[in-house]
Amino acid sequence: MQVFWFIPTHGDSRYLGTGEGAREVSHDYLKQVAIAADTQGYDGVLIPTGRSCEDPWVVASSLISATKNLKFLVAVRPGLHQPSLAARMAATFDRLSGGRLLINLVTGGDQAELEGDGVSLGHAERYEQSAEFIRIWREIIARSHTGESFDYEGKHLSVKGAKLLYPPVQKPYPLVYFGGSSPAAHDLAAEQVDAYLTWGEPPAEVAKKIADVRARAAKFGRTVKFGIRLHVIVRETDDEAWRAAESLISRLDDDTVIRAQAAFSRMDSEGQRRMAALHAGGKKRTRADLEISPNLWAGVGLVRGGAGTALVGDAKTVAARIEEYAALGIDTFVFSGYPHLEEAYRFAELVFPLLPRKLRQKLPGTGLTGPFGEVVANSYLPRVSQS
């Protein structure tokens, strides 16, 4: 099991849909979140992409020297990047970071954003382009280890004599992650990528997605790993966790929710449509309305695009829900929580000890020994909890 955190390059706050409690997205703050994830033992971080975010490659590059073991899941965007340039970017990042790059292939589903970026393809054509893009990208990087070039002539993309002189650390290339809920997305995942990511839907729906992608991959003689993207609200008790969930959306007003949902409805994204269906437009916002499956809460999706659900509960409950998804075949969990700095620590402290995963050293390379904590009465080290 791998557990990732999230770098909030699109903003961070204590409350959704308001400027109250908001934080400046400064490099110092993003670095704090990355260092927290690194020192607490997270395997990696997802860095989001889109016009609402700081550029993921610039941000990720700036965080290499601030971290030691943390991997970076960074987006490539067919239509915005050329595959040969994206291959060079990936190889250089992987070399400079010592093999800590992971690739997030993002086709995109916001038509207004895509057109603003110069991408005018329809849904089916975007997936065709993405398939050609990642095929070229993979071949260029894989052949860099033996000094070979690559030719390709496709419907949307072509290269002749494409070659990468400086190969990445990872062989044959950094692992490729990809998410999408349409049949075209599942076909692409089955044929081309290493790990399929889904947003947090109820377990029964996630199981259907996994089964479909597995069946499609089998036709190509391939196996695919699976991951899930979720928010998390964990506290020492269930009641505290649900109060925190209610607090997160306590500053929302109807107008903000209506405008957000109207914007999401215009997107050409099956995944976004499925997220919106979970809360029925957000007209009612009680726990009964938003708890769509045990401890799975759709409140985040009232105003946030993309991943819109959170696991809510005490540590044992959240860990049990994680294991429920793991039993379906999920082996990578990408979490986030508001605010991201505090919640990175809270989740690691409360939930990590309960997960069936081998934790890497929390303070890599320091050689420090415990127990840790403030000395009691100037004389005594705090006892380690036996719970």
From Swiss-Prot:
Record EC number: 1.14.14.5
Source superkingdom: Bacteria
Molecular function in Gene Ontology: alkanesulfonate monooxygenase activity
InterPro entries per UniProt: Alkanesulphonate_mOase_FMN-dep (IPR019911), Luciferase-like_dom (IPR011251), Luciferase-like_sf (IPR036661), SsuD_RutA_monooxygenase (IPR050172)
Enzyme class, first EC level, given as a word: oxidoreductase
Gene3D superfamilies: Luciferase-like domain
Keywords in alphabetical order: Flavoprotein, FMN, Monooxygenase, Oxidoreductase
CDD domains the UniProt entry points to: Alkanesulfonate_monoxygenase (cd01094)
Biological processes annotated in GO: alkanesulfonate catabolic process
Task of the protein: Catalyzes the desulfonation of aliphatic sulfonates.
PANTHER family, per database record: ALKANESULFONATE MONOOXYGENASE, ALKANESULFONATE MONOOXYGENASE-RELATED
Protein family: Belongs to the SsuD family.
Protein name, per record: Alkanesulfonate monooxygenase
Organism of this sequence: Polaromonas naphthalenivorans (strain CJ2)
Native organism taxonomy: Bacteria, Pseudomonadati, Pseudomonadota, Betaproteobacteria, Burkholderiales
